[in-house]
Amino acid sequence: MHLKDKVAVVTGAASGIGKEIARTFADAGAKVAIADLNAAAAHAAADELNSPGPRAIAVAMDVTRESDVDSGMAAVVSAFGRIDVLVSNAGIQIVAPLDEFPFAEWKRLLAIHLDGAFLTTRAALRQMYKQRGGTIIYMGSVHSKEASVLKAPYVTAKHGLIGLAKVVAKEGARHGVRANVICPGFVRTPLVDKQIPEQAQKLGISEEAVVKDIMLAETVDGEFTTIEDVAQVALFLASFKSNALTGQSVVVSHGWFMQ
């Protein structure tokens, strides 16, 4: 039980990667807060985790709203007494050429990824500093390292998370707080499934070509990364015992990006 007696907050945890991370953490002994904009889905995910016994709560949270984040994190502390792990995972994707990208959509995407990461980090650090320890994990992407067409704000935001993690690693060290970034390749989640027809239409190619020739072309084996792959990396980072591993980004992508 790598996370026995630990408390984790996972944003965007009602579905996809976040939900799998929450399940993996709970199975490893943690108490988990399912934080999500979709309150009904968050409660449903928490109910699933609670079927073996109470180990999860749902927290309705718009990560771009300061009041939502601060009250949500306070609710976690009220329920479980502490916060040991934050996984900043909430995010969206909008696909369009840069010269056609609406400014409002640019701001919305960056707010969810970067403002959300900042607000949840700040709230978590205030509790972690009191406890003299904790770990923060940001959900980056191979797009934290590479660029792709049609994804200007997403690439910008994911690069920004690496910078934030490095600052948190430096500022948090004397308080026993670590920060790292997971950089998955393409994972077959609803977020990616939505992109496939969108890119096919904008690029004038088939959906099969989007998958084979764009998404998986640079992998070593033509395979998608899985939510289980990402969750296991999150568990490794969450349960690491010292500050030896901090300020780093871990790419899990079937070799798409090698560093």
Spans of features found by a protein language model:
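Residue(s) in the substrate-gating loop at a strand-loop-helix junction
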Residues: 141
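Short, small/polar-rich loop/turn modules that mediate ligand/substrate recognition or access, typified
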Residues: 87, 173, 178, 245-247
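Substrate-binding pocket helix/loop in short-chain dehydrogenase/reductase
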Residues: 97-98, 102-110, 215
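C-terminal helical subdomain
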Residues: 181, 189, 205-245, 254
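Short C-terminal tail/terminal secondary-structure segment
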Residues: 4, 146, 234-235, 246-259
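Alpha-helical segment proximal to the catalytic Tyr-Lys
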Residues: 126, 170-171, 243
